[in-house]
Structures are given as C-alpha cells and as structure tokens.
Amino acid sequence: MESGQKAAAELLKMHPRPDAVFAVNDPAAIGMIKTLQKAGIRIPDEIAFVGFSESQSALIIEPNLTSVAQPTFEMGRVAAKLLLEQIRNYSETIGPHQSISLQGKLNIRESSQRKDQMHIQ
C-alpha cells in the first residue's frame, strides 16, 4: 500500500489528472484510492481504478476494487510441467524460447464504473 500512497502523492501533482489508473497490484491500487479519497478525489467519478491480483481486500475497500484475477494455480502447474520437461531432456544448450499465455479474469466492480454507468451484470 505504501507504493500506492507515494504514487497517489505524485498523481495529485498532475494537471490534468488521468481518468483512470491500472495499478500493478491490488495493494498499490488500495493505497492510491485511500490517499486520493483523503484528498477529496471521488473514486470512480474523478479517477477510476483497476487492480491486478484479485486480493480479498478488493471487496473490503469502498468502492469495491475492479481487479484482474490471475490464474496462479495454472501458472504454477504449467511452470512445474515445463521444469520437469527441461530436467528430463537436459542438454548443455538452451532450447528455443517458449511463450505461453494463460487466461485471466476481469472482475468488474464499482471502482471502475461511474455511478451513471453502473448496471447489474
């Protein structure tokens, strides 16, 4: 949260300010939101927020934080599988680069929706 508080202090100096912030993780987003709210900024009416980690804190803060859920279990499973394959097929040369994409999930909540645009999904 401390990094979010520092980022919010910098954001308050900006003119014009951004319409939205996509934070590196939920704690940073929450730190920014709390700091900006203390400064009188209305979230999401003035600045919308999205976090990245789908922490339990996303549901505790007001407004509830929109957040991207990462498929952490699947990441671990794929990483372990790749590591075991490398161990089984060990050689002195490094194999070709491999890129793997996993599907995250955007959980839309109040922090990213202006009151006049909110609807129940």
Regions found by a protein language model. Name each.
Residues 1:
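Conserved active-site histidine-acidic residue motif and adjacent donor-binding/catalytic loop
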Residues 9, 13-120:
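Flexible loop/turn connectors
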